[in-house]
Curated annotation (Swiss-Prot):
Keywords: Cell shape, Cell wall biogenesis/degradation, Isomerase, Peptidoglycan synthesis. Belongs to the aspartate/glutamate racemases family. It comes from Salmonella gallinarum (strain 287/91 / NCTC 13346). It catalyses: L-glutamate = D-glutamate. This is Glutamate racemase.
Amino acid sequence: MATKLQDENTPCLAATPSEPRPTVLVFDSGVGGLSVYDEIRRLLPDLHYIYAFDNVAFPYGEKSETFIVERVVEIATAVQQRYPLSLAVIACNTASTVSLPALREKFAFPVVGVVPAIKPAARLTANGVVGLLATRATVKRPYTHELIARFANECQIAMLGSAELVELAEAKLHGDSVSLEELRRILRPWLRMPEPPDTVVLGCTHFPLLRDELLQVLPEGTRLVDSGAAIARRTAWLLEHEAPDAKSTDANIAYCMAMTPGAEQLLPILQRYGFETLEKLPV
C-alpha cells in the first residue's frame, strides 16, 4: 500500500478491517525509536502501533529536564485523546531518565522506558572495560551513575557523550552516507586508550542505526549491547498481565510534530516499517 501523507485537518483514510489489536505508542524525539519499535514488532507483529517523533524539539539531549517532562506528557496526552492506549514505550534514553514518573502518575496504561544496558554489558565484558555511548544528557544523569554503581561497580566504565552521533543516525535514515572518519574523530578518546572497551553500551536508541559503521571503526571483536530485545520482552509481559483492554482495528500510523520537508522525506522509510500514514499531531 502506498504511504499517505496527511495533515491534522485531513481525515484518516479507512484502514483495512482486521481483528481488534492492542494499541501501543512508541515515542522518541527523532527516528532512533524505530530501532526499539523494530525489536518489539519482531516479537509482537500483530499489534496496532503508533510511532510519534518530536521533530520540533529534537534533539532532547540538549533540553532541560523540565522541558522534556512537560513535552513528553503533552505529546502522550494528545495521542491518547485520539487512540486509547494499551501501553506506551518511551524509546528515548534521555526522555526515559526524567519523564517516566510523571507519565506513570498521569496515565493508567503501563509506560516502558529505555535505560542503558549496563547490567548485561558488565556480564559480557572480558577485559573489564565497558564503554557507554550516549547523549551528553544521559551521561550526566544521576540515574545513569546509579545504574553503574549498582550493576557495574567492578568494571571500568568509559563514558562518551555525543550529540553528533544522533545527527549522523538521523542523516543515515534519511539516506545520507556516514563518514567513518567522522566516527573515528568522535570515538577518538576510546581508540587512544591502551585498553579500549571490549563491550559498548549503545545508550541512545539512535545508535543501533549506526551499528555497522561503529563495528568498522571500533577494535575488532567489540560487542555492541542495546536494550531493544529486553524492551520487547517487557512490553509482551505487560500487555499480557497489566495493560488495559484498549484495542483498535486501524492501520499503523506515525505522527510528527511539524510537517517539514525532512518529515516528508521519511515517508518511504516509515512505509518500510509498516506505517501507512504520517500525520502532524497538533500539540
